[in-house]
């Protein structure tokens, strides 16, 4: 079987104009904790006192420039990566002014597999979850688009492969995992990615457990007889229909499983848990748990959001209603393809994919 014609038709060989954004940096622990929750749906006014109190407790954030990759087209017409290397300078403190911008913000959420089994085998980290979040600060509209990990894309500088391979390639190179995933999405989807935030499996578990677990309404029974377990083993999962209160490890299994359905149902579960986490956080008195959460998340979350942007997004969260958080899917814009070697891919109809992206990123007038 040959892939559909559109499998080999990629976006026009033109680089996406890089958006204006700060250079990637490792944030202070308080910023990491707040960002991870903020992106899970916008926690409104609860975040503002946490931000200010944490800033007083941990001091100012020092910015150290690091390289980031951008896409260029070589004379052969194929995409390659180059590094924008900033001039070295002494770290300088970053203040926390109010944000007065009105431009749309696109944030890439990454769930990263750094399990001991991968480390023991010498394997690089892998992006297990990718969700593109687009926020319009004027209309207060939010769009969320899960990106299936089996999606066949052109990875700049590496050729055609599943999109979740981009993180591993980047992690083994100077481009970094988040940097190469961001460049891959910008090139294939034609959308700028202004920021990223990533959390590893342990960070996700800690977020859920620190919030006291999460309650999810399972729409249909889920059975998975081959869910990955510790020590290169498998375990059997079963989730009955109805309301289920899950601890962190159970919630992680719920969002990762896909043997009983497909990547699109898996993406829907990921969005469902993010929304449930948002509701759980809003119902709790977060100030009582802020320091606990900050300590728990140390080393498990990374982002290039600046503290000033975190504060601005926290203020914006006050005015975002849950009915204005919209979910999107690539289902219907991709088709199944089994390669001769037995590998499975999702092949995109790129005009249809870009139409979905346009619908998510163009707010009503």
Describe each model-derived feature in a short phrase.
Residues 2-365:
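Non-catalytic, solvent-exposed segments at the cell envelope interface
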């Amino acid at each position: 079987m040959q892939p559909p014609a559109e499998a080999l038709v990629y976006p026009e060989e033109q680089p996406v104009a890089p958006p204006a954004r700060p250079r990637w940096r490792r944030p202070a622990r308080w910023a990491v904790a707040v960002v991870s929750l903020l992106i899970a749906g916008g926690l409104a006014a609860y975040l503002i006192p946490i931000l200010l109190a944490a800033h007083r407790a941990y001091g100012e954030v020092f910015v150290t420039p690091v390289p980031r990759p951008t896409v260029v087209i070589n004379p052969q017409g194929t995409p390659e990566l180059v590094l924008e290397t900033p001039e070295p300078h002494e770290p300088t403190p970053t203040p926390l002014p109010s944000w007065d911008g009105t431009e749309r913000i696109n944030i890439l959420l990454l769930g990263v597999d750094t399990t001991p089994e991968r480390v023991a085998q010498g394997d690089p980290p892998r992006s297990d979850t990718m969700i593109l979040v687009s926020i319009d600060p004027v209309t207060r509209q939010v769009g969320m688009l899960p990106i299936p990990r089996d999606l066949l894309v052109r990875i700049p500088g590496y050729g055609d492969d599943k999109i979740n391979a981009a993180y591993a390639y980047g992690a083994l190179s100077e481009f970094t995992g988040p940097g190469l995933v961001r460049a891959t999405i910008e090139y294939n989807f034609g959308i700028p990615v202004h920021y990223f935030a990533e959390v590893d499996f342990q960070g996700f578990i800690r977020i859920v457990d620190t919030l006291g677990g999460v309650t999810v309404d399972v729409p249909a029974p889920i059975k998975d007889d081959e869910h990955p377990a510790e020590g290169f083993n498998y375990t059997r999962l079963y989730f009955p229909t109805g309301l289920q209160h899950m601890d962190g490890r159970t919630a992680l299994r719920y969002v990762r499983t896909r043997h009983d359905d497909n990547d699109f149902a898996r993406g829907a579960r990921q969005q469902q848990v993010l929304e449930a986490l948002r509701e759980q956080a809003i119902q709790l008195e977060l100030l009582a748990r802020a320091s606990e959460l900050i300590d728990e998340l140390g080393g498990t979350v990374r982002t290039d959001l600046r503290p000033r942007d975190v504060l601005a997004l926290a203020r914006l969260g006050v005015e975002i209603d849950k009915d204005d958080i919209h979910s999107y899917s690539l289902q219907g814009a991709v088709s199944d393809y089994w390669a001769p070697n037995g590998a499975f891919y999702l092949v995109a109809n790129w005009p249809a994919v870009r139409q979905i992206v346009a619908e998510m990123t163009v707010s009503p007038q």
